[in-house]
Amino acid sequence: MQRKFKWNNIEIIKNYFKTLSKYDEDSIIDSINLSDMILFSILKIYETSEIQSYKKSLEFDKTFMDQNTSDFEKNKIEDFIKMALDKKVRFAKPVYDFDETKMLGSTFSFLSTVDNIAEKELSDAIFDKRLYIRNAKLLRNYTGTTYSISHNPYYEILQYSNGNSSLTLTHEIMHGYINKLTDRKFYKDGPRLYIELVSLLSEIYQNDYLYKNQIISFEEYITNTNDILLANVTEEIEIIDLLFKLSKLENVPEKNEIDNLIKKCAIKNPNYNFTIKKLTCRPLESLLAYLYSFMIAVGIYENNKDNSKEGIKTAIQIMKDVDFDSEKDLLCYYGINVNESYSKFVDENNLLVEKAKGSI
């Protein structure tokens, strides 16, 4: 594949280490360290935390829910989980025809509709050698990541044959963009469940943009919408439901108690087909960050379908202003009805899927 830019992986990694040495350890997000960078970018391995015992994992989940989420958030999550488990989402046969040579161009083009700071962040990341793009044969647990170092994050994007990495690139660049606007608020003490808000909303808007500008086909548009729903809700909703229930218990239950709970849930929902090992794959904090941010993102999107600039502006303002005392009033002020908006989003997705199948 021909590209305008030649990605010198070793040079980028050296530059990362050089930049890393300029900052105090406290300025770097705890979960990103030198060994992570080696695993991610040199050995090209991504492993989850399955080596942790399930009790430690569940204790971490419980601590997060007790200390880092508000009662308002807990109630929102509980209501949304119930609805999402009942709401049937239809999926079309996936079509991946996106021309990856257009990835940078289409990303620049979309970001220019957001504002010049977002567009400049992508340009600077390329110029400063902070962007690392590589091909990947198999889909693992992530398609991209942002290594947040002060205001100059590093980005790693994986290109797959079964995905649109332009959406991934936009998602990660918007993390760097929002870090600049909020002084890395969500890596400090901000409400952590909002950390993915602008990034996920940008994915939805960019998918619309690519389709309206005939950069992707109708089938690709539906595939992207399906993938967004899968990644943030439907693929993980059962494990989120279980972990959420476990986090509310006074003590971490024994394995046999959890097995029994899984079996009870499976009677009503056959998608409860995971083993206890799945409980340690990803912490509840990470799963809820995507779920909760997506809930709010869809609420903003449904209110500003034809005005991506206003929608993203609203999301940015919420991320700037939100704290545990203001979030209820903020969502009310912007007229965000989470469950109603998600229901509309899914209904529209289902209609498009039926249209693609020729059923309507």
What name fits each language-model region?
Residues 182, 189-231, 293, 334:
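Post-HExxH zinc-binding segment in Zn-dependent metallohydrolases
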Residues 168, 172-176, 180:
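Catalytic glutamate of the conserved HExxH
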Residues 151-169:
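Short pre-active-site segment immediately N-terminal to the catalytic Zn-binding motif
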Residues 61-68, 180-189, 208-222, 248-253, ...:
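Inter-helical turn/loop segments and adjacent helix faces that build the functional surface
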Residues 211-282:
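Long, amphipathic alpha-helical stalk/connector segments used for oligomerization, subunit docking
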Residues 30-155, 333, 337, 348-357:
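Contiguous, non-catalytic segments that form substrate-binding/exosite surfaces or channel walls
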Residues 47-69, 83-85, 256-360:
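C-terminal, non-catalytic "cap/extension" segments appended to globular domains
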Residues 22-29:
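Charged, low-complexity interaction regions
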